[in-house]
Structure formats: C-alpha cells, structure tokens
C-alpha cells in the first residue's frame, strides 16, 4: 500500500497541475484554509453512468490509464452496489437531450436505517484509509449518499469514465488522506442540498454576493436558502449565457413534488470581485434550508461523516424530476467555453485539497447544471416575454375599454343632459299652461263675465221674439243677421274658454252640454249659410235652415241658467232632482195601468167606436186624453148610440185610478220633497246666521283689545279680565273671582237648559207618535 501510494501521489499531483492549467482562466482565486477539507453535500445528484457526449477523454494519458486500472477491478461491483443500494429507491431517469449516450440523473430521497448503518461502517473504513488504492465497491454508495464528504475533487477526472461507456453509479469517497495536498485548490467542488437542480444559469448580479468570512470551517458559509423564490434571470442583469450555449425555447424546467419555488443560493468566494457567479435558482424543498441543516457544523470534525450525513437527510424526501434540454454543443465545448462551471461550484464552499476523481464528475455536473440553468432561464425569459406581451395587450384592451366607457359616459351624459333639458322645458310649459288655465277659470267664474253673458242671452232672446213679426223681420233683416253673427261668436268664445279652464269636466254639467249643443247648431247654421248662399231658394235647404233657426229659440233657456245663482231656483231644482226616483216609480205604475185599460177597451169597443179604439196606439192616446177629463162625455154618448152603454163604469174606474190616485201621488212626492228641502235650507241658513253673528262679536272684541293695547301680548285669562273690567267697571280681585264663577255657572245652566229642551222635543215627538198610532188603532 505504501509503495503504491508514492507513484499515485505523484500521478495525482501531475493531474492536479494539468487540471489547474486547463481551468485556470475560468476560476477566481479561492480563499482556503488548509486542513478544512470536508464539504457538506446534503442532496447531491448522482450521475448514474452518464457517458461523455463524444465518448472521448479529456485527461492526459497517464491519468486515463491510471483511472482505467483503478476502475477495472470495481466497475461491476460499483454498478451493482449503486443499483441495489442507491438510497433504497429506484432512480428516475432524467434526460438532458444532449446525446443518446447520456445517462440518467436520479432523484434522491432519504436513506433507510439499515442502509445508513452499513454505509456508516463503510465510511469509517474509508475515512481512516489514506491511499487511493483504498477504492472498493462500498465507495460507490458513498458517492450516492454524498459523494464528496470532506474532500475536493479534480476537475476533468471522470471524463474518462464517461468516455469508457461504463455506467458508473458512483465514485469512491475519499475522506482526508495522503492524496489531499495542503494548499489552495481552485477546482474543489462542493454541492448544495439539491445538486439535482444543477445551477440553472449564471447570474452576474454582484449585489447578491454576501461576503461571508471563513470561521474555522471553510465550508460553513451560512448559506441560507430561503423557501421563497428569489430568481434573478440572466437577462435581467444585462448578461446572457456564456460561450454559445443555445437556449431551447421548448425546454422545460424540473418541477418539484410539492411545487416549492426556487431558492437563490448566495455565496462569496473570499473577497467580493466581479468574477464571482451565483449558483442560480436551486429548486429545493422549503424545509431543507441551511437554517435547518446547520447540523453539519457538528459532524465535520473528521468524525463519522456518514452517520452525521444521514441526519441531514431526515429533513424530508426530495423527489426531483428534471426536464429535457437540447444544447447543440458537446460537453467538450461546454467545459472549455463556459467560464463558470468550476468557479460556480467553488463559490458555495471554500476550496479544499484537490482530488482527481471528483473533478471529472463535477465537470459533468457543471455542464448539466449549465444546461438546466439555461433551460430554466430560457423558460422564464420566454414566460416573462409572454407575460409582458399579455400585459401589453391587456393594457391596450384596458385603454380601449376605458375609451369606450368614456364615450358611453359622455353619450349618457349628453342624453341625460338633453333629458333633463326636455324635462325642465316640459315642467316650465306645464306650469305656464296651469297658470293660464287658472287665470281662465277665474275669468269664467267671475261675476262680471257671468253678467255679460246673461246680458247677451237676454238680448238674443229679445231678438228672437222680434223676428216673429213679419214686418220687423223684413225691415231689420240685415241688422238681425249681424247681431246673430255677433252672438254666435260670443257663444263660441265662451265655450272655448270654459273647455280650456275645465277640461273634460266641462261636459259633466247639464247646462254646459245644453250650451254646447246650441253653439253646435249655430255653427252648422252659419256654415250652411256660407256654403249655400246662392242656393237659398232650394226647398230642402230652406227647410234645414228653418229648423236651425227654430233651434235658436233654445237660447232662451240660457236665461234660466243665468238665473241659477238665485237661491230659490237652486232649491227648486235640487228638490226636483231628489224627487225624481219617487216620481219615476209613480209614472211606471201609471203607464202599466194605461196599457192594461187600453188592451181591455180595444177588445170591447173596437166595433162600436173604431175611430177611438181601432188599434192599441189609438186606444192609448184616447185614454191619455181622459187624464185631462176632456171630452169623456162625448166618448160615452157615441158608444151608447152604438149599443155599448157598459163603457161608462170602465171609464169611471180608469179616471179614479189614474187621475185621483197616481197624479196626486206625484204631487204629494213633489210637495214632500220641497218641504224637506226648505226645512233643511232654513236650518242651514239659521246656523250660518248664528255663526256669522258669533264671528262678528268675536272680531269686534278682538278689535277693541288690539286697539287699546296693540303692543301688549296678554294671555286668555288676562283678556277675559280686561273684558270684564270694561263691561262692569273697576272691581276687586275677590269680586272678579266671584263674577267669573257666576258666569261659569250661568253658562252651565244654559247648556243644561238646551239639553232639556232637546229632550223635551224628543218626548213630545214620541207622545205625538203614540197618540197617532192609538187613533189609527181605534179607527181600525
């Protein structure tokens, strides 16, 4: 073991120098403390046999031979061990879309307890060994659990592994040892909680670099990966992916089982300088924060790394699925052109002593990290562009909507303004019309207008009477025609004024209907005279004109209408109106009796007196004339001459029923109605007279009080006292009180007397009714 270790150390140093020269231009000067050679890798991606894209090695021949010899003895066991014990779960294949020979990147979960114990024993055995030849099949499983516990790795080591086409499911874990040279190692790599996210892009936002000094443990950088998304896309910082990495717009970023946002890894490589790179947005479970996983401070002191590493996996299962990414360049171009894979990996923890095998895997991870970062960045750039377009379109639509809304509001305001203007005009016009109608109503109801119309009606009546004389009509024909036209115009104006003032209620009055009919007849007469002035000698037209002229006699009735303001006339007309139902009933009885007697007389005396009893109508007319008691003796004598002497008892019965009963009933109803109306009128007049007298007395007393002391406002009692003093002179207070009490008693006595009188009147009526009923009973 010791003999083999010497050449192996030399070989490793040579490989380290080669790798240093190979990546010198892409890394920033590290800040490293010797002796702190353990890096914590909480959820590291395990490259299960990912071959190189072109199937060739990038290592020197010596390193390639050495790696092939070391791998040949354990490749089968390593493959088998990683297949059987890779976290106790199947690794989900993940394609990066590079080449068909690309392997699968598994998703990691927490270890089982039994597997943890076995790996802990294996880790102790490998941790104590310092030879490179200590590589055996259990070391592969260390790589699955956390492939670089306490060691840096040489970049470019495992390229020969990928070129050989052997599916390497893990590499040996080298914990300390003679192959870890002391000093700054710019190509050591440390992995975060989830190496599966693989540094989705390079961000150049230098403001996000937090300068965290190395305090004893170079890899304890207090890197807090917060659960919220702090994704800073590359285009937001004004920079793009390096060295021709093509971003596929159709690539998709890996999604989490719990949908947690990407966290932003903040780090610092010693001093703050522009060449530092962020590790992008690492998709990570929010419970796997470095705040919660700082337990690695306690078990990175050259102790059992595997047992302590198991505790960091207890935070929860991490299931990851990666997305397809198409990048046209080979892994060689990604390694040589991308300036940040090694430097970006070294930015998480301090640089440690180099290890030749870890660098190759780290380079492959760096390339996959760049691809994943480019995929995520391209998708987010594309998503942001789409969202920007959508926001612009939405802004345009919003602007158009606001314009349409503004136009609608303006139109609505215009309509509302026009509506308000129309409403205001309508209200104004209605107010003017109402005022005009009120003025016309006051005019038509005024005494002057009534007097003028009454004078016109009287003059028209006198003119109609004068036209009955032939000599006056012939001499004053022209004057009569002129006056008739003037009267006609006055009647038309009166009707129009009343229709305007009263509206349709004008036709609800009988007198108004009579006036309107007379006015209509006058209009027809005037029109016929004007249109047929040359056909005046036509017989039919002449008769029509005579009819209209005779109807002008109805204007005399207007005199009675103008006399309606007289109280007596109003009482008579009111009484007739109230007695009409009773009169109508009596008239129906009279007509029934007349019809019965007509039928009997026609059947009996049709042959004896055919002139009077020929048919039912002539018989009714004959009986109606008998109501006047005219010529009833002639009817009897003619019938007796023809042998119908028995007509006399029938005529007597008819005259008694019709004349003495029914006609007297009509007169009785009218008289009773008139008496009732007169009594009510008298009572009403008496009450009105008493009310007027009382109001007059009260007004006189108030006038005297106001005239005496106009400025003094006295109460009701004071006013009464003053009134008493004026009537009875000066009195003492005791006398005033006694007088006031006396007046109250007198008033109460008068009230009681009034009640007594009313009760006595009721008793008198009852007694009278009783005596009348007794007399009727006695007579019966």
Swiss-Prot record:
What induces it, per record? Down-regulated in patients lacking sperm motility.
Comp. bias regions, Basic residues: 211-241, 285-299, 402-412
* InterPro entries the UniProt entry points to: CatSper1, Ion_trans_dom, Volt_channel_dom_sf
Q: In which tissues is it expressed?
A: Testis-specific.
Segments on the Extracellular face: 470-478, 532-540, 605-615, 629-645
> What processes in GO biological process is this protein linked to?
calcium ion transport; cell differentiation; flagellated sperm motility; regulation of cilium beat frequency involved in ciliary motility; spermatogenesis
Q: Which intramembrane spans are annotated?
A: 616-628
Segments spanning the bilayer are: 448-469, 479-500, 509-531, 541-563, 582-604, 646-671
- Top-level division of the source organism's lineage: Eukaryota
One GO cellular component assignment for this chain's record is: plasma membrane
Catalyses which reaction(s): Ca(2+)(in) = Ca(2+)(out)
Give UniProt keywords alphabetically.
Calcium, Calcium channel, Calcium transport, Cell membrane, Cell projection, Cilium, Developmental protein, Differentiation, Flagellum, Ion channel, Ion transport, Membrane, Spermatogenesis, Transmembrane, Transmembrane helix, Transport, Voltage-gated channel
Cytoplasmic domain ranges by topology: 1-447, 501-508, 564-581, 672-780
> Which cellular compartments is it found in?
Cell projection, Cilium, Flagellum membrane
**How activity is regulated?**
The CatSper calcium channel is indirectly activated by extracellular progesterone and prostaglandins following the sequence: progesterone > PGF1-alpha = PGE1 > PGA1 > PGE2 >> PGD2. The CatSper calcium channel is directly inhibited by endocannabinoid 2-arachidonoylglycerol (2AG). Indirect activation by progesterone takes place via the following mechanism: progesterone binds and activates the acylglycerol lipase ABHD2, which in turn mediates hydrolysis of 2AG inhibitor, relieving inhibition of the CatSper channel.
Where does the UniProt entry say this protein principally localizes?
A: membrane
GO terms (molecular function) for this protein are: calcium-activated cation channel activity; voltage-gated calcium channel activity
User: Is Transmembrane helix one of the keywords?
Assistant: yes
Regarding the membrane, this protein is recorded as: Multi-pass membrane protein
Q: Which PANTHER family match?
A: CATION CHANNEL SPERM-ASSOCIATED PROTEIN 1
Q: What family is it from?
A: Belongs to the cation channel sperm-associated (TC 1.A.1.19) family.
Its annotated function is as follows: Pore-forming subunit of the CatSper complex, a sperm-specific voltage-gated calcium channel that plays a central role in calcium-dependent physiological responses essential for successful fertilization, such as sperm hyperactivation, acrosome reaction and chemotaxis towards the oocyte.
Q: What is this protein called?
A: Cation channel sperm-associated protein 1
